[in-house]
Amino acid sequence: MLAMSIGLPTHPAKCYAASGPSWIAENILNNTGFVGRISRDLVLRELPLRDAVKFWGAAASRRSAAELLDVLSVTGGVPRYLEEVRPSLPALENIRRMCFLPEGTLFKDFKRIFADVFGPRAALKARILRAIADGPLNGAEIAKAIGIGRGGTISDELDELELAGFVAKDAGLNPETATRTRTSQYRLSDNYTRFYLQYVEPRATEIEGRKYKFAALESLPRWSTVLGYQFENLVLANFDRLQELLGLKGTEILSAAPWRKKAADGKSGCQIDLLVQTARTVWVVEVKRRARIGEEAVDEVRTKLARIRFKGRKSIRTALVYCGELAPVVRGSGFFDFLVPAEELFR
């Protein structure tokens, strides 16, 4: 029946596999001509860090977490991209080869996958991704940024981008009301896409003419900010491992998502990188990637806590997931209940 309904030749001994999430949803799952039960609805996610690091083979044990994360900040945990990594080369050379040469896999792949997956609607979806490349936005903010009306169109486009793995919809519990957040935030969750839109696409002509010389990640505009977003994506994508490190394995999680409180009525807002809520406890998780992480990390989280009016009498715990040199004052302050170095996410 499936083969007949979508125009494929039928054969009793053959099984057909279709790819492209939006095509499958539109032409099979939501097609009235499809009759039958779905055996399995499987969405392939990127590899967890403990598996992604295996692409470095024996060299992984000799590489710093920072160097591994430099590459993963560009590739994410996508196996096809990790196959292009040469473990013997430094991170910067791997990135140069993959992104900043005309024959590089990551230089060519964005337009190809977008055209294959989304067809004629690829241009609109790319505009949406550009709008959230600088940080998460809600649906109304995205519609305004790209100049289209709010409503079904933007919702449908975001749903397809989420299904395809480009976007994550963050909609946890509001800690001030203990109810589901009414306005979801849409985050660009695919590290390759953000890196491409921020740094490769604007230089495409120079790269094609072999005139662009990539020297260092630090020389890229706003790299420290983008690096923070990329590291946050990797931490959020590896929440299962983080649960273990925070002693939450086996605990029922009511909500786990970034949370943003807007400024209103003259009061300042705040952004929590990851807010984990259980029946009795709220975990405020800060994610930092800097060369040196000092007392400002403590001050920032303390300020955020002061701006949130937690509902009920729950315990509050704090955690810092970090990559960089941790100043002794941070550990000595005792402010963070858990300090999680990036190395632990790979284990």
Language-model regions: role of each:
Residues 1-216:
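Phosphate-binding site recognition
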